[in-house]
């Protein structure tokens, strides 16, 4: 179970083997620590040392996401000391395995972009432009496959160039299905200046915590990436693996709640150079993302949740690095 603690005046405490949630000092709920897989903190409040210790003892991640859609911190049990996996991960930076994985991440991302546009085209009468952009996006898959499996440092610029072209075409089609009132003209990344980008950023932050957990449990180093180059303090491997899941989990969810008017432009306000999501809209988005993570699809002939697929991909990456088990990025046809 993923537990969300939001709003103001909330506190998280411990009672025996339970996590207790309070509001303005009054107990409002409690849960057995062993039943919690992760806690998302999205409001203003506090957490006791005893609660943190109990969470760590039960291997429960505690993740704080601020209103800008940035992960402020992630608290977890001590790192799993899997030296063999990490050693192979570092060695892979100097050989063809790094290029193989970098290509796999981007190929899966582009395949999912193609899939999302296919879904959009099926549900709309005016779909010619979406189909046109989908075909352009699809062409980039072949370009990725043609790149040599060599050290990622030697092909990174080529991979990112192809990824950038595909993303430009994808976001152009994405924008075409949104009402003009949203003023969405393309993906802007961090520092969102419009409501849709702020929703995307927040949604990505929610699944980023899932990616961290997958990498941690697989014994991998989150700061040693293959597609995204190393930079001090940057969790490059987290940004690598999340590329496979943005479209199916977050992009589709944001499109759904916006186009169904479950969220309106009135649910946002300017705060300095940022667009701030009001609490009601933020709660709705988090609930929809968590519902998506818990929903199940057919994957390798099994009915499995998106959360478990994310865990599987981390383990598969570790198996590829240590045992040569082929790594295939996660993607769907639709």
Swiss-Prot record:
Tagged with keyword Magnesium: yes
Keyword match Magnesium: yes
GO molecular function: DNA binding; endonuclease activity; metal ion binding
Entry-linked Pfam families: Cas_Cas1
CDD domains, per the entry: Cas1_I-II-III (cd09634)
Entry-linked InterPro entries: Cas1, CRISPR-assoc_Cas1, CRISPR-assoc_Cas1_C, CRISPR-assoc_Cas1_N
Transmembrane regions: none
Cofactor(s) annotated in UniProt: Mg(2+); Mn(2+)
Annotated Mn(2+) binding sites: 163, 228, 243
One GO-annotated biological process of the protein: maintenance of CRISPR repeat elements
Keywords from the named record: Antiviral defense, DNA-binding, Endonuclease, Hydrolase, Magnesium, Manganese, Metal-binding, Nuclease
Record text on subunit structure and interactions: Homodimer, forms a heterotetramer with a Cas2 homodimer.
Primary role: CRISPR (clustered regularly interspaced short palindromic repeat), is an adaptive immune system that provides protection against mobile genetic elements (viruses, transposable elements and conjugative plasmids). CRISPR clusters contain spacers, sequences complementary to antecedent mobile elements, and target invading nucleic acids. CRISPR clusters are transcribed and processed into CRISPR RNA (crRNA). Acts as a dsDNA endonuclease. Involved in the integration of spacer DNA into the CRISPR cassette.
NCBIfam families: cas1 (TIGR00287)
PANTHER family given in the database record: CRISPR-ASSOCIATED ENDONUCLEASE CAS1 1
Similarity field: Belongs to the CRISPR-associated endonuclease Cas1 family.
Entry protein name: CRISPR-associated protein Cas1 2
Source species of the chain: Methanobrevibacter ruminantium (strain ATCC 35063 / DSM 1093 / JCM 13430 / OCM 146 / M1) (Methanobacterium ruminantium)
Gene name of this polypeptide: cas1-2
